Amino acid sequence: MNNLKSLCKAVSIITMLSISSSNASSWASPGDSSLRSDVELLAHYGLISGPVNSWPMSWKQITRDFYKADSMTLPTYVSHAFNRVRNKTPGEVNIKTKAYYATKVQSFRGFEDEARSKVEIKGTAEVNLDSASLHIEARYNDNENFNLDGSYLSQEIGNWSAYVGTVNRWWGPGQETTTMLSTNARPMPSIGIRRVTSEPFKTKWLSWMGPWDAEIFVSKMEKNRHVPEPIFVGMRLNFEPIKNFEVGLARTLMLCGER
């Protein structure tokens, strides 16, 4: 009984910590289709500004216009979506566990987070500060494989976030797959930089682009391939010149490698 009370107390403390801050520096990673649908709906109603088709998305970008809801009369279903997203906003400390069981492992993965084996356990621990975030995501499956896919360390520098880790990415509006980067393959160790919030350019020469974001990263691919350990470079620019009309430009390169 004492152990149960201690466990309940610990869970209560974790819960309190996890909702203690809504301004933490972290990302919403691909893997939650419900969150993505809500984000796209809120963007349509003006509660989220800027591009929404590249994931991960900064939580600061997602929530920075939420204050507008106080002066808006929203349909009931939009209010529900707003509350769901707000409740998912991470706090300073977050600890989660999740178990997966699948009778058949999917050969192709969509946006939703799915197991890569029949049985899989995932644990997530996250610490968010005003300008830095440490996200540890550990997975163990029935093949006795352990990995840290989805883990990263990020630090904001002005309106940019520099990061290192194995980051899952989803570039494009597709729901089941994308033409560039998706979560179908495991993420590669990478180092990169991406924009935090999508404020438009102030200069008259580029202000026509509207809200914009960008990312560039460099990864090292695996050894077990025809050309071992090549360097993989990815770049993407998204901008919204007209409300709810988003343009995405992306480029990937594979360089070097051992022979």
Regions found by a protein language model. Name each.
Residues D113-I121, E144-S151, E156, N184-R194, ...:
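Residues that define the transmembrane beta-barrel architecture of outer-membrane proteins
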Residues A10-I19:
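Bacterial N-terminal signal peptides
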Residues A24-E112:
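N-terminal periplasmic/intermembrane-space "pro-region" immediately following the signal or transit peptide
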Residues I95-T103, I136-Y140, V164-N168, A214-K220, ...:
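Transmembrane beta-barrel strands of outer-membrane/channel proteins
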Residues P51-W55, R84-I95, N128-L134, N159, ...:
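Short loop/turn motifs that connect adjacent beta-strands in outer-membrane beta-barrel proteins
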Residues P51-V52, S107-E114, E137-D142, T179-S182, ...:
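Outer-membrane beta-barrel domain signature
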Residues S190-R259:
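Signature for the C-terminal beta-barrel architecture of outer-membrane proteins
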Residues T124-N128, L153-E156, R194-V196, N238-E240:
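Transmembrane beta-barrel domains of outer membrane proteins
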